[in-house]
A protein has these predicted regions:
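Extended catalytic-interface subdomain
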Residues: 27-35, 39-43, 47-53
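Short beta-strand/turn micro-motifs at beta-sheet edges
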Residues: 19-22, 77-82, 291-293
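M16 family metallopeptidases and their MPP-like homologs
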Residues: 28-38, 65-181, 202-210, 216, ...
């Protein structure tokens, strides 16, 4: 049974999704528990729920994920927090599950969350989650995408819904400091109680596999388009064809010199003539050589440990790659892999 009786008031939806011929239909459903979380303009709340998703579902041994896997609810369990919209929502999903176990799915989630509220969150997991997202925010590594472009996109997370708050999501550093203090005062447990347990703006959605559904949908679309075409006059059809050709020609044509000149470009005068100074301050710590590079890192400390491997036999060298891959993901003498993961991030 679902605790607190709230399971009866959730919106319930069952839908089908397409699978290929030969794909299993049994134990191949998706079960999801979804809750709307406050307002997208509440930056602290949104950052806090990103941390909660990490602590409850993403980190190795995360309690909600582990409880569902231990109960064999689905072959994979994951969470999502959809922000950047006015009504963000938090989802817990079991993949490759039995569609008839949705009540058990819900009961395990709620029971686990109630235990967490009663006994408290794992403080190391919270600390690790907060530090993880603070690190990502400070580093702002957008790979090959220009940082200015990505910041420009980020401002829309708040600006779309309040013209007076374009920079709300660019000013997060103080929030991480605040969350570190609030984590010790029951803040995250209160969020779980309010938004994940007592929240009635929620749904239980089940996706059931169906063979041939893609072909059915294609046939329905073709029929709909055919009916629409038959409703058009000859002139209307010719106009659609002409508009399509015009659009294709516009997309393929070369840009004019005038248009190209509107693209801002760097000038030689924009590039500094002075080279970037490299700092390689060498000193020793406990007999180990340390090279220190004093450069701006936005408050992030980077540490690289380099080991001399010349004494590793040639036949064992391939296993060094395996060792690198499992470090941090297996139990050690003093920590389980879940504890170790949080210790590293904390």
């Amino acid at each position: 049974s679902t605790s607190r009786g709230l399971g009866d008031v959730y919106k319930r939806q069952v839908h089908e999704y397409p699978v290929l011929d030969g794909d299993p239909l049994e134990n191949n459903a998706y079960l999801s528990y979804n809750m709307v979380i406050g307002s997208g303009l509440d930056v602290k709340l949104n950052v806090a729920f990103s941390v909660l998703k990490y602590a409850l579902l993403d980190a190795p041994g995360a309690p909600v994920k582990q409880a569902l896997l231990d109960a064999h609810i689905g072959k994979d369990v994951y969470g999502s927090y959809e922000d950047g919209i006015l009504q963000p929502f938090f989802s817990i999903v079991a993949k490759n599950a039995d569609e008839n176990e949705k009540e058990k799915f819900l009961s395990i989630i709620r029971g686990t969350l109630e235990d967490i509220v009663k006994n408290g969150m794992d403080q190391k997991a919270l600390e690790a989650g907060i530090n993880y997202f603070e690190f990502r925010f400070r580093e702002a590594d957008f790979s090959s995408f220009p940082k200015g472009l990505m910041y420009g996109i980020d401002v829309f997370d708040s600006w779309l819904y309040d013209e007076n708050k374009p920079f709300a999501y660019l000013q997060q550093l103080a929030i991480y400091d605040e969350l570190k203090k609030l984590a010790k005062e029951g803040y995250f447990e209160n969020l779980i109680q309010t938004y994940l347990l007592d929240n009635t703006h929620a749904s239980i959605v089940t996706l059931i596999p169906k063979t041939g559904l893609a072909a059915e949908n294609d046939a329905k679309t073709a029929e709909k388009l055919q009916k629409y075409k038959e409703s058009l006059s000859k002139e209307e059809i010719e106009k659609i064809i002409a508009d399509t050709k015009e659009l294709a020609a516009y997309q393929e044509e070369e840009e004019s010199e005038e248009a190209l000149e509107t693209i801002p470009l760097l000038k030689r005068s924009d590039i500094k003539r002075e080279s970037i100074k490299l700092y390689n301050d060498e000193h020793e710590v406990d007999g180990t050589t340390v090279l220190h590079h004093n450069v701006f890192t936005n408050g992030i400390g980077y540490l690289s440990l380099l080991f001399d491997t010349k004494n590793v036999p040639n036949d064992l060298i391939p296993y060094m790659g395996v060792l690198k891959s499992v470090l941090g993901y297996v139990d050690t003498e003093h920590y389980t892999y879940g504890e170790l993961f949080n210790e590293i991030n904390a």
